[in-house]
């Protein structure tokens, strides 16, 4: 059985091609890089140029925008959005319905609360509690 593709027209009228990810069957642009150990829910999608690293999870309805990076073991919650060029650090959690703005950064181990908005270009820092959870703070 060959690889099947789904095509969408983007906001500029350019036809973009997506394939179903091996782990979870979510839609991944052919120019995105998603590790086979990452889980992409069937209702989630990863846009062109984005990268999803090892053991990351993109939850139901999650959207990883163009050129964004979701680092190792990070979790993107239900209907959460990672903006264009944003970076979600290792072991970070983006809560359900949260929005990470374009070019924003979520530090390693940080937990972005449900429905929170991280503004374009901002940095969301890990709290002491977040770091303790990971064994990184006294």
Regions found by a protein language model. Give the residues of each.
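Extended, small-residue-rich solenoid/repeat segments and analogous flexible loops
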Residues: 1-67
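Glycine-rich hexapeptide-repeat left-handed beta-helix
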Residues: 2-27, 66, 72-138
């Amino acid at each position: 059985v060959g690889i099947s593709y789904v095509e969408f027209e983007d906001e500029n009228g350019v036809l973009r091609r997506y394939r179903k990810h091996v782990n979870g069957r979510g839609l991944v642009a052919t120019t995105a890089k998603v590790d086979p150990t990452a889980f992409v829910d069937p209702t989630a999608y990863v846009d062109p140029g984005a990268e999803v690293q090892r053991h990351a999870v993109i939850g139901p309805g999650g959207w990883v925008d163009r050129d964004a990076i979701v680092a190792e073991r990070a979790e993107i919650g239900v209907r959460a959005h990672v903006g264009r060029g944003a970076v979600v650090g290792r072991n970070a959690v983006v809560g359900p319905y949260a929005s990470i703005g374009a070019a924003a950064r979520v530090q390693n181990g940080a937990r972005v609360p449900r429905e929170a908005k991280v503004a374009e270009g901002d940095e969301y820092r890990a709290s002491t509690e977040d770091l303790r959870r990971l064994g990184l703070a006294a």
